[in-house]
Amino acid sequence: MRRSPPKPWENNSGGGGSTSMTGSGGISRPMSGPQRTTSPGGGSSTTTQTSTLNNTGSPSTSVGGPLVTRPRTPMRPWESGGAGSSSIDSFGGGVGGSSGYRSSYGGGYRDSYSSGGYGSSGYGSSYGSGGSGGYGSSLYGGGGYSSGGYGGSGYGSSYGGGYGSSYGSGYGSSYGGSGYGSSYGGGYGSSYGGGYGGGYGGGYGQRGYDNMDGKGGALQSVVSSGHSWMEALHSIVDTFSRFSRLLDANFDAVHGSFSSIIRLCQSMSHFSYEIMAIIKTYSLFRMFQSVASRFLRVFRYLLGKKSKSNSSNNNTSSKFGSNAITESLRQANMDVSDFRNFQNEKKQSVGTLILIIAATFIGVPMVIGQLLNLRRRGQASRLDKGWEEQQGGGYGQVKAIYEFNPETTRDLPLRVGDIVNVIDKPHDNWWVGECNGLSGFFPVDFTEKISPNDINNNNNNNNNNNNNINTSVQIYDNNNGFNRNNSNNNLNNSEYSDYSSSNNNNNNNNNNNNNSNYQLQSNFSSNNDGISKNIIYNNNNDNQRPISPSKTSQQLSRSELMDKPYVEES
């Protein structure tokens, strides 16, 4: 790559001061970056400028200390509508003049042969399209061998083409390139490729030589090859799917045939079962027939009848050899009259046969039924005896000698003369017994042991209806002070008193008992620790009734008391 010629605004003539090359009406290039100033000795030194804008809009530059005002940028030709220069630079038209916003050999902002500002061949170039040239003029854009910018050769360029192109298409390209006006491909106005303004390569992102032919290049080839590969893969997958469907159909066919064979075997098994049932029925019929024939033979023998074979033999023998028999009997000096009398005997009546059949088919089952009933009665008696032994024989039986009114739901009520079957003896003073269909705990001191012989001599009346007990049952509630009095109740079996609060004192006084000469007074009180104690005061115990052993019972709460139903007995 050959070197680019020196730029006009950077030339130094013989080490003298920097010369600004501008033509008539030329525009000075804006100074950007470090500026070169000429030292008194002829050398150039680089100083940093500080640019500011004055009130008129022109930048001012401070070089080395004093403030230097930079000239105002003149109007551009496409902004003013006229030619801003009297001549066009060599090897291509710019905006005017030989330097500034134009370049030689296709320069853009400051390019030579390609480089990038706003685009090589940007605002007027040779050998490359103009970026934004006039509406078709060869002066302000385009010209030479390439197209103009907005219209380069659309509205007046040579060699025809799209909206302003030469030898190609696009919006203003040359030889097929894209962009706003490029030659030999390119981007926004570059020569020989390039992006937004690069030469021989990338600018803002173009691919350089890849887009020189105006086609997709490697990307298009990759896309096309990928498309072919996807089609091949799709065909392979479709083939496998068809093969899988074929295998599925074969599996269904094999499964159906196997199922049909299994159903056939099952049907054959049912058929063989039916055939065997028929054969069994026929064999049972034959067996029954043989047994019946033998049974009839036995009956015939018992009835004195001969079988058909014997009778036929007798008939034949009587026909063919009766005379011979008589002759032989005569020769043996035997009396034939007895034999003839036996033959002339009358046959037995049918009643005998009916009697035998009735005795066989009716009498025998009756006898068997009676035997079974006797066996059942024996088993029942043995079970009853074992139950009695289990209920009363294990621990024996006791007789109640005093009445016992249950104090809890687990107690067994007793009356004088009741026979109690002892079930268990969990404690020394309290046993578990059963009486009158009820079971529960009863005090041992209220009973006495008896022998089995004394049970039959018990003529006591268990329904002791002569006891007229006048009681008053009171239920106290702390919340609403409810008092309920039930008097003159005839209680035959039991008497219950419920206490709902740990702070209540319930006095159950049984003062009137016409049948006994004793008086039992019970005071139920509660202490502060919530444990109910049963304190029994025996004031008048005329008949020396023993007092039941003390039991510590848990006090019922109000909720438990309300849950229990209260039943009045009249």
Curated annotation (Swiss-Prot):
Biased composition (Basic and acidic residues): 560-570
GO biological process, one term: cellular component assembly
Localisation per UniProt entry: Peroxisome membrane
Keyword field: Membrane, Peroxisome, Protein transport, SH3 domain, Translocation, Transmembrane, Transmembrane helix, Transport
The protein's assembly and partners: Interacts with PEX14; forming the PEX13-PEX14 docking complex.
Stretches with biased composition (Polar residues): 544-558
Claim: Oxidoreductase is one of the keywords in the record: no
Compositionally biased residues, Low complexity: 32-58, 453-543
A single Gene Ontology CC term: peroxisomal membrane
Residue numbers spanned by region Disordered: 1-91, 453-570
Organism whose genome encodes this protein: Dictyostelium discoideum
Protein name, as recorded: Peroxisomal membrane protein PEX13
Mode of membrane association: Single-pass membrane protein
Function comment: Component of the PEX13-PEX14 docking complex, a translocon channel that specifically mediates the import of peroxisomal cargo proteins bound to PEX5 receptor. The PEX13-PEX14 docking complex forms a large import pore which can be opened to a diameter of about 9 nm. Mechanistically, PEX5 receptor along with cargo proteins associates with the PEX14 subunit of the PEX13-PEX14 docking complex in the cytosol, leading to the insertion of the receptor into the organelle membrane with the concomitant translocation of the cargo into the peroxisome matrix.
Annotated SMART domains: SH3 (SM00326)
PROSITE patterns (alphabetical): SH3
Biased composition (Gly residues): 13-26
